[in-house]
Design a protein with these regions (language model features):
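Short catalytic/metal-binding and nucleic-acid-binding patches
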Residues: 1-125
């Protein structure tokens, strides 16, 4: 089955989730969560990613971002996920996948959906 295309909608708020491969707890140590966070901040600088909120759990991440320009979200997620996985695998001397297939994106269309996503982030879901 073909993958769905990603859409660019200027000003659109997206809730992004990305799970570790096989739901493993690859982000269980604060060192690994901090590295993911550092790559997030690098993406903000490099691509001008607009981050509203984020949460990093032991086996997945959540991001609330604003789509500001074509490929900003795509390039940012490639940088963050790719570098996090490379560093982890190099440090642990492993070659396995770090992330599940693709990150999942949900469009936040109204204030209620935004509030629900924000509350989930704050509660760690």
């Amino acid at each position: 089955m073909a993958r769905a295309n990603r859409h660019h909608i200027p000003g659109q708020v997206w809730h992004i989730t990305h799970r570790c491969h096989k739901r493993e707890f690859l982000l269980k140590f604060s060192k690994d969560r901090r590295r993911w966070q550092q790559w997030l901040f690098e993406a903000k600088k490099r691509y001008k990613l607009q981050v509203l909120d984020f949460a990093v759990t032991s086996n997945h991440i959540h991001l609330l971002v604003v789509d500001s320009d074509k490929n900003v979200v795509l390039n940012s997620l490639q940088l963050i996920a790719g570098r996090t996985a490379q560093e982890f695998n190099k440090r642990k001397k492993r070659k396995d996948a770090f992330w599940d297939d693709r990150y999942h994106v949900t469009s936040i269309r109204d204030g209620r959906a935004y509030t629900e996503s924000f509350m989930k982030l704050q509660m760690g879901f």
